[in-house]
Swiss-Prot record:
Primary gene name: TOA2
Pfam family, one: TFIIA_gamma_N
Protein family according to the UniProt entry: Belongs to the TFIIA subunit 2 family.
GO cellular component labels: transcription factor TFIIA complex
Keyword Cytoplasm: no
UniProt name for this protein: Transcription initiation factor IIA subunit 2
Recorded GO MF terms: RNA polymerase II core promoter sequence-specific DNA binding; TBP-class protein binding
Keywords, alphabetical: Nucleus, Transcription, Transcription regulation
BP terms from Gene Ontology: positive regulation of transcription initiation by RNA polymerase II; RNA polymerase II preinitiation complex assembly
Keyword Protein transport appears in the UniProt entry: no
InterPro entries per UniProt: TFIIA_a-hlx, TFIIA_b-brl, TFIIA_gsu, TFIIA_gsu_C, TFIIA_gsu_N
Summary of subunit composition and partner proteins: TFIIA is a heterodimer composed of the large TOA1 and the small TOA2 subunits.
């Protein structure tokens, strides 16, 4: 009998606008006894998987950015950069987007716990 190995994905995208809205909606459903917490965890795990796969397969756009590196750190195979006075420029576009401060979190492209 074959057993299916559970794949794990980074939970980074739960901190995006969409992830926060999903988490809030699930919390409301749990509070109102509409779903149980185990189902909410399965939904969030599915969200993590789908967002990671979609970004990897569908998004091909590139951008350039330039700014002043304020601080950086490397912990548990995750790089974190805080950049101030940053300018973004999308490929093929003449428009520049500016921000006072941006936090970039970079993880290994390999799935956690795998060598692939």
């Amino acid at each position: 009998m074959a057993t299916k190995k559970e794949e794990t994905f980074y939970e980074l995208y739960r901190r995006t606008s969409l992830g926060i809205c999903l988490t809030d909606a699930l919390d409301d459903l749990i509070t109102n006894d509409r779903i149980n917490p185990q189902l909410a965890m399965k939904i969030l795990a599915n969200f993590d998987r789908v967002v990671a796969e979609t970004l990897q397969e569908k998004v091909k756009a590139r951008l350039q950015f330039k700014g002043a590196l304020d601080n950086y750190r490397f912990c548990d195979d995750v790089w974190t950069f805080v950049i101030k006075n940053i300018n973004f420029k999308l490929d093929g576009g003449n428009q520049t987007i500016q921000a006072d401060k941006v936090k970039i979190v970079s993880c290994n492209a390999k799935r956690p716990g795998t060598d692939a």
